A protein has these predicted regions:
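FAD-binding core/adjacent interface of flavoenzyme oxidoreductases
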Residues: 1-5, 60, 64-154, 184
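Beta1-alpha1 glycine-rich phosphate/pyrophosphate-binding loop at the start
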Residues: 2-72, 165-187
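Residue-level detector of alpha-helix initiation sites
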Residues: 11, 36, 112-114, 134, ...
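Phosphate- and divalent-cation-binding pockets in alpha/beta enzyme and binding domains
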Residues: 15, 116, 138, 162-163
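Short, conserved structural micro-motifs that define repeat-unit consensus positions
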Residues: 154-161
């Protein structure tokens, strides 16, 4: 039987694999991730600064550890470029090489992408989106390089407010901008 394939190595993908393994330890599983497939709790990103957690302290396990723990193949840094549902086949690209991957069942656990605003100007290089551990690492590096402790957060939803609180606790002066009349307007 062909493997069950999970596209995405975020919280949903790893939780699905973990829960499925409890029910079926034998079925072949393959996880495909466009990034390094490091397992971490994404909510940690919005409060790690105040907790003095370096990016290296956040992961719960790298791809090799998770592969062994969940008895599944993990294809990291691999992009799905096509899905053929009739043939139950994926086209994958890794390091410029293309290959096919068959599946019995396919699960899309790709998460969400943040809205990236088209903002220009001489400070546009200082705009960071923090949606992954890789993004968080780059954000922390940029904060460490700057003498200026001012930070502007676009979005006063739960994550934006958590980031604002986290940054304030670490000595940053934070301004939160949102279209809503008040913070947490959608809750």
């Amino acid at each position: 039987m062909h493997p069950i394939v999970i596209i995405g190595s975020g919280m949903a993908g790893y939780t699905l694999a973990r829960e499925f393994r409890k029910l079926n330890p034998e079925q072949a599983l393959v996880m495909i991730s466009a990034d390094d497939a490091v397992n971490y709790a994404k909510p940690t990103l919005s409060n790690a600064l105040a907790g003095n957690k370096a990016p290296e302290q956040i992961p719960l396990g790298d791809a090799a550890k998770m592969s062994a723990q969940l008895s599944m193949d993990i294809l990291s840094d691999t992009v799905v470029t096509a899905i053929d549902p009739d043939q139950h086949e994926l086209t994958l690209e890794h390091n410029g090489q293309t290959r096919q991957q068959v599946y019995s069942k396919l699960i899309l656990a790709v998460g969400a992408n943040p809205i990236r605003l088209a903002i220009g100007g001489d400070a546009s290089d200082d705009i960071h989106v923090v949606n992954s551990l890789i993004d968080y690492r780059a954000f922390r590096e940029r904060l460490a390089e700057r003498d200026d402790k001012r930070v502007v957060i676009l979005g006063a939803g739960l994550i934006g407010c958590e980031f604002a609180n986290d940054l304030q606790h670490t000595g940053h002066h934070v301004t939160v901008i949102d279209l809503s009349a008040r913070p947490l307007g959608r809750l």
